[in-house]
Each structure stands twice: as C-alpha cells, then as structure tokens.
Amino acid sequence: DVELTPDMVMTVYGSQEGMGHLGMALCDEGDVVLLPDPCYPVFAAGSLMAGAKPYYYPLVAEHDFLPYVKDIPEEVARKARYMVVSLPSNPVGSIATPGIYEEIVEFARKYDILIIHDNAYSDIIYDGAHGGSFLAVPGAREVGVEFFSLSKSFNVTGARISFLVGRPDVIAALRKLRSQIDFGMFLPIQKAAIAALNGPLESVQEQCNMNQERRDALCNGLREIGWDLPNGKGTMFVWARIPGGRTDSMAFCMELMEKAGVIVTPGASFGPHGEGYVRFALVLPPDKIREVIDAIRRSGI
C-alpha cells in the first residue's frame, strides 16, 4: 500500500497527455533527461519541446530489457533532471524484477534525479507475477512520481482517464502548467473512474487472463516457426527479434505485410536499440493468432 495526501494526486487526460506536459513543466532548455531506448515516443515529447537534451539508456536482452543504471555515465547522471522508467514496459514487454526499483531509487538519491514512472500497464502482468507501485518501495515517494491509467485495465482507452501521484512539488508544477491549458476532467468521467476503481475488479483479471492466452498463442507459435524466444511478460504487446539475423525492421515489416498480410510495428520506431525487433499487439483472439502464425510460416519470410 502507498499512503498519499491530496497534494500528491492529480487527474490527467490520459498518461500520454500527462507525460508530455510534465516534461514541459519540469524542463528548461539544455537540461538532460534520461529516457529508455526503446521507449514509447511520448516519453521524449515534452522534454524535447522544452529544449532539453535526451540521453537514451539502452534496454537490451542481456539485461532482460530492464533499466541498468550502472551503465549510465556518472557525468551524464550528475546533469540529469529526471529519468523516465516504464514497467511493465511498452514496447519491450518487460516487468519489474526483485530489487530493480530499489536500485533505481538508490541511483536517484545519489544523483538527485527525479524518477517518472509510467505504470499504465500495472494490471497486465502474466504468469502469476505481480505489479504494484514503484512508490511502495522505501524512499521512492521522495524521489518520484507515477502515472496510472484506466485505459488498459478497464478497456476505456478513448475516455482518457489517468492520474499522477507522488512528490507534491512535481504535482504542483504540472498542476500550474495545466491550469493555463484546461479546466480539469469532465465530472461524469471522474465519477465513472471512481466507480470502476471501487467496484468489482474481476473484469480486470479476466482481461489479463484473456491477454495471457493471446500471448501464449503468439509466443508459442513464433517459437514453433523458428523465432527466438519473444519477450512478453506484461503489457498487451510482445517484443520479438526478427529471425534470420535481419536488422532492418522497417523493411521486414513491409515485406511481412505484403507477403503474409500481417501488420506489426518496426522496432526502430521506438528508438535505435529497437532495430532488429518488431512489436506485436495482442488484439486478436487465439484462433486468429494461430492463423497469423500460419500466414507468416507460409510466406517463407
């Protein structure tokens, strides 16, 4: 559990909007921000518009696609304004492992860095693993804030219902910026969100189970046709290395679409370290996913 006071909570129109505006609220021109690579593109948007300089820390298979703060140069860390972390992670599908948040908190304390944690997929974690909040880790409330979203957990993507919790000074900075942009979330939507959070949560687990069945069908199928072990421990996405040693993800995606009729997202669209990978979205039922696997197999790609 995480204890919060009112000055540690605010609503936002989706974590994407909140993330973009938070970068604008916190950054000055020339500030350094630490961003994952690969990452969801909006992580960079607000800071770039504010004139900040991104330093991309790699998420690689050797470290299970998790942040490895020991590889961030000290001269970069000393200049950093904040670090964005996202677990479970879109696009790479990794989830927090024991000790990872503690390492990040220690790193943040050492270099006086704010941690912005995107927890939009907190309820979509597979194989009996548990998510929870970054802020539950001792010391995290002093160094971080965290975005939560109802979009994925409750299947209300278009409603744009999210909230930011954590350090009061960061909440105040974003609230000040947004006070000049909008007048808050539509009240009926807020009441619907309250009802969802306080109501029965069986549907959240049912949706997670549904996504896990899709994940299993996709990952098992890809392995059967010769792909490397895909990464899909959480989120509604699976991150997979392109087979055959191919590295041009855009060219592969175009060929896959033309020859198999299958559309996936090129890894390079999420950053340089995404090259050589593709992202699958778990948007089809298992029987359709098996048809997709068969189409890929028959294409000969």
Positions of PLM-derived features:
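PLP-dependent class I/II
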Residues: D1-I301
